[in-house]
Amino acid sequence: MTHPIIRIHVRDFGTMTAELYPEKAPKTVANFLALIEDGFFEGLIFHRIIKGFMIQGGGYTEDMEHKDAESIRGEFKANGFMQNDLKHTRGVLSMARTQDPDSASSQFFVMHMDAPHLDAQYAGFGKVTEGLDVLDAIASVKTGTYGWYMQDVPKVPVVIERMEIVSK
């Protein structure tokens, strides 16, 4: 099976290249590629950054306005999707969600370090193959609280300038 290759261009930080795994999470990969093709991620930010854990983006603008996307089925073992055995190790891309296992839409996270407690609980669907230095730099930004409910928000926006599909 061919693994799609994508690039995530982050303003002032550089580029992360990732390989996606449709054999692990086919609908997740198809949804992510469709969002990239639609330009959905352009101008959105990494809005939650926890050094030693992960960076999360794909759902908020620089002004912290939420951008909605359609939800898809969560393709992970605890949700009955047994073929996804991807471990949440450094560099893995995975879908963020609420408590509802079928609430993943556009928000994703990139593992800064291994987090085995997420295995089988979230839909991992790819892995950074180049640009781990970019991941490290993003994970090191200063964060704080936004409003009364959002924690680990970067003090200065970490903007996804664009994402591109290198190959399908």
Region locations from a protein language model:
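Cyclophilin-like peptidyl-prolyl cis-trans isomerases
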Residues: 1-168
